[in-house]
């Protein structure tokens, strides 16, 4: 079932959370709402779910207006960041909960509930944990159980609010790949909120970039990465170098460069900024030689040694030691303004 929002606006006091937002999501599509904190992505998700009402605009499911439909009637599966499992219920009882609280006229028989819950636990590959309690599960297992519970009521759409935000990095990566595979089996319209750029680009069919209550760009991961529509999108999706210059009659000049800019063919001495990602630079042989052999002159200031656990033995540097820093060769094409790079320190032997 498709989801469509038209001209949604929402204020909380003087704060404008959403400003004339419109979006269409097809059945079977997995869409990421991506943006910084306070951009409106969670508010948009909650309005789609019926947990929040908009000041203006409408929400449509499969072309039918659902704006005024109660949350209990929308048939939406919702997964929260912090699982929201019932601590006093077993895994089986948590997944069965939505089925057992249905109105008597819609409630399945106990045999049907048993079969459905075991099928769902098998789907999320945790049927062997049916008799455990949430406190006995890992964070990743709890999140998969929360997803099984959301699917138990056969939702028309699936909404996930930062579903992996409370998990450690390794588990988060494993679960998001698992979610992608699972979603392909379900064929429902799914929307998930995240502030993790890598997560959105890896998992989603399309990415919706949001900022200050507005949609900045909608596109496939490749489209938003290779063709950012605004400076915000460029900056939010990764490191970028900003080169200030002037555009005139389809040519941009700045930073000692002259580049064709056909989209600015009508410009006359207009200030313009060129955006270049670090990996897009090509270095001449002379520049590569400079990068490979660039060293700092000796310094005589106090420095501190910072090291990883894989280097258990580190010699502390004293004031009289001379320090030389150089870039690793593998990093020579990953420079960006304000970024960081590894350095090799070698105290001069006395």
From Swiss-Prot:
Residue sites binding ATP per the record: 35-42
Keywords on record: ATP-binding, Mitochondrion, Nucleotide-binding, Plasmid, Sulfate transport, Translocase, Transport
Domain of life: Eukaryota
PANTHER family: SPERMIDINE/PUTRESCINE IMPORT ATP-BINDING PROTEIN POTA, SPERMIDINE_PUTRESCINE IMPORT ATP-BINDING PROTEIN POTA
Pfam families linked: ABC_tran, CysA_C_terminal
Coiled coil regions in record: none
Top class in the EC scheme: translocase
Catalysed reactions, semicolon-separated: sulfate(out) + ATP + H2O = sulfate(in) + ADP + phosphate + H(+); thiosulfate(out) + ATP + H2O = thiosulfate(in) + ADP + phosphate + H(+)
GO cellular component: ATP-binding cassette (ABC) transporter complex; mitochondrion
GO molecular function, one term: ATP binding
Gene3D superfamilies per record: P-loop containing nucleotide triphosphate hydrolases (3.40.50.300), Periplasmic binding protein-like II (3.40.190.10)
EC number(s) from the headed UniProt entry: 7.3.2.3
Record's function text: Part of the ABC transporter complex involved in sulfate/thiosulfate import. Responsible for energy coupling to the transport system.
Compartment(s) where it occurs, according to its Swiss-Prot or TrEMBL record: Mitochondrion
Limits of the ABC transporter domain: 3-237
UniProt-listed SUPFAM superfamilies: P-loop containing nucleoside triphosphate hydrolases, Periplasmic binding protein-like II
Name of the molecule in the record: Sulfate/thiosulfate import ATP-binding protein cysA
Family, similarity comment: Belongs to the ABC transporter superfamily. Sulfate/tungstate importer (TC 3.A.1.6) family.
Keyword Plastid (UniProt): no
CDD domains the record matches: ABC_CysA_sulfate_importer
């Amino acid at each position: 079932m498709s989801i469509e929002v038209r001209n949604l606006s929402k204020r909380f006091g003087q704060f404008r959370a959403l400003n004339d937002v419109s979006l269409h999501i097809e059945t079977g599509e997995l869409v990421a709402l991506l943006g910084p904190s306070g951009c409106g992505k969670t508010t948009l998700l909650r309005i789609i779910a019926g947990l929040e009402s908009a000041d203006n605009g409408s929400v449509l499911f499969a072309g039918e207006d659902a704006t005024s439909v109660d949350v209990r009637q929308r048939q939406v599966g919702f997964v929260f960041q912090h699982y929201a499992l019932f601590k006093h219920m077993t895994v089986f009882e948590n997944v069965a909960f939505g089925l057992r609280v249905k109105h008597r006229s819609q409630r399945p028989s106990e045999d049907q509930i048993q079969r459905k819950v075991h099928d769902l636990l098998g789907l999320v590959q945790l049927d062997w944990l049916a008799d455990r309690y949430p406190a006995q599960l890992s964070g990743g297992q709890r999140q998969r159980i929360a997803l099984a519970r959301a699917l138990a009521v056969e939702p028309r759409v699936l909404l996930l609010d930062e579903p992996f935000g409370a998990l450690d990095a390794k588990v988060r990566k494993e679960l998001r790949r698992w979610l992608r595979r699972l979603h392909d089996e379900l064929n429902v319209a799914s929307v998930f909120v995240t502030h993790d750029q890598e997560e959105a680009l890896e998992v989603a069919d399309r990415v919706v970039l949001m900022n200050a209550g507005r949609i900045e760009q909608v596109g496939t991961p490749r489209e938003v990465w290779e063709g950012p529509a605004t400076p915000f999108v460029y900056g939010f999706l990764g490191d970028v170098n900003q080169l200030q210059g002037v555009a005139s009659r389809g040519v941009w000049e700045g930073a000692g460069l002259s580049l064709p800019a056909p989209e600015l063919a009508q410009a006359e001495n207009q200030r313009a900024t060129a955006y270049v990602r670090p990996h897009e630079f090509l270095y001449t042989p002379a520049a590569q030689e400079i990068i490979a052999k660039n060293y700092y002159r000796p310094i005589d200031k106090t420095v501190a040694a910072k090291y990883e656990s894989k280097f258990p033995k580190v010699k502390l540097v004293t004031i009289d030691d001379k320090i030389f820093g150089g870039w690793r060769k593998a990093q020579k094409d990953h420079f960006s303004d304000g970024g960081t790079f590894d350095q090799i320190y070698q105290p001069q032997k006395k």
